């Protein structure tokens, strides 16, 4: 039996975004996570140019983030992944480890469920993402379960040079009134590309 998680994904994402710098790059996984990123930016008048929302691309966020990290080595790249998405393309962790981008910060929001497509259970709480990452060559791995732990871990990760993974244990579910992005994927891409330009 697994201990019930108290932190929501939305609380975790808000805490993450609060800790990032204006020049940091964010790639978020498909579904609820990207919707929560978009809504939080809108509510705080932060704009959406810093975030690439991986709409309909389950499992691909970390490889998109990897490509950006390799090309933008002078900037921090944060990948907001899900346990279901990470498990779907588990080889991505090995690829990240083999290429060793020092500026890639891989965050897995683990609620043990495919939350965006019906809430079916995953094996996210049975798999040890930290050990998989370590065996694949990630230099720094850690886990958080509270907003304070997220704050502390992110502060440490930011100062570390090297490929990092932070697993955040969360409960499944989302607000019933959670909105959807009001930008099209093409508009998101164009604003994001402009943000990446020198």
Report the location of each language-model feature.
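Thiamine diphosphate
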Residues: 10-14, 19, 25, 39-198
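N-terminal glycine-rich anion-binding loops that anchor highly charged ligand groups
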Residues: 29-39
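Conserved small/polar residues in nucleotide/adenosyl-binding loops
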Residues: 1-5
């Amino acid at each position: 039996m697994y201990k019930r998680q108290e932190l929501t994904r939305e609380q975790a994402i808000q805490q993450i975004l609060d800790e990032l710098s204006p020049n940091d790059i964010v790639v978020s996984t498909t579904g609820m996570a990207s919707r929560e990123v978009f809504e939080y930016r809108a509510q705080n008048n932060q704009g959406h140019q810093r975030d690439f929302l991986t709409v309909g691309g389950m499992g691909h966020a970390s490889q998109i983030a990897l490509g950006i990290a390799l090309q933008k080595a002078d900037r921090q790249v944060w990948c907001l992944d899900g346990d279901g998405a990470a498990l779907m393309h588990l080889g991505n962790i090995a690829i990240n480890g083999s290429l060793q981008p020092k500026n890639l910060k891989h965050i897995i929001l683990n609620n043990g469920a495919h939350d965006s497509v019906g809430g079916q259970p995953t094996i996210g709480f049975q798999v040890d993402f930290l050990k998989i990452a370590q065996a694949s060559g990630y230099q720094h791995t850690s886990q958080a379960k509270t907003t304070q732990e997220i704050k502390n871990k992110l502060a440490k990760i930011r100062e570390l040079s090297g490929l990092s993974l932070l697993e955040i244990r969360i409960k499944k579910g989302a607000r019933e009134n959670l909105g959807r992005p009001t930008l099209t994927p093409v508009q998101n891409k164009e604003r994001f590309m402009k943000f990446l330009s020198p």
